[in-house]
Amino acid sequence: MPFDALDTWLTDLERRLDPVAQFEHFLSLELGRAATADPWQRDAILSDVPGGATAMRICRQAGKSCVLATRGVMALERGEVTICLAPAERQTREITRKVATYLRGTTMTVERSTMTEIETNTGGRFIAVPASGATIRGFTADQLLVDECAYLTNDEEVITAVLPMLKDGGQVFYASTPAGKNNFFARLFLDTKPSDALRLLTVRGTQIPRMAAKVERLRTQLSQTKFRQEVECEFIADGQAYFDLSVIEAATSKTEAAIVPKF
């Protein structure tokens, strides 16, 4: 085997054995330059909760769709079926486009594709659909990806419809920026019980060095409440409430910290 061919073969083997290396390869294809995964992206790519779920609370523009698309490609390589839900059709098309881009960095071939569905020669399928109880029934999946979970309409109805589609041992990946406290995604973080088969990841914009300039720009342009929600990933009381619930909770707390002001 010529040296160049051997080098290519070894590089491809490394990516197959190391999902993070594969993810970085996909990013480089998309960005047109070398890319390195953030620590949280490594955690999300490697997260393995058979029969359970991983919930990712992530700031805007941090790269969560890249992680979800990579999880989709990894499942295609195994010949599995992935269902990806998003609040709107535009978002389903965008993540399908990203999966198609990443597939060009693999040895798989596409047998059939539409704007929201891809089938490969491994027998795997990636299907992206707008999240409504009516459109998602009837599928069976090995993996479920829910993008912008906090923004789903009728979220409890949608989740109730989709969870029975998972095969035994199938995994769910919820990803979103927070959008208030009164939704399914918020309850995953606020009401989690220790016995739940659920892994929680929180990624604030202030924790990502490559986003430092953008974070400072948003700090000056967004209201304090919006910055806390969009960048710091806090679950803020819904806009209908005149007072932020966290302020009310602190004011009514009987702890010394709440009663005695600090100067």
Task: State each model region's role.
Residues 1-53, 261-262:
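Pre-P-loop entry segment of helicase/translocase ATPase cores
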Residues 205-263:
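ATPase catalytic-site recognition across NTP-hydrolyzing enzymes
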Residues 97, 101-103, 143, 151-222:
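ASCE P-loop NTPase helicase motor core
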Residues 79-101:
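Conserved Walker A/P-loop ATP-binding site and its immediately adjacent core
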Residues 93-142:
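Inter-Walker segment of RecA-like/P-loop motor cores
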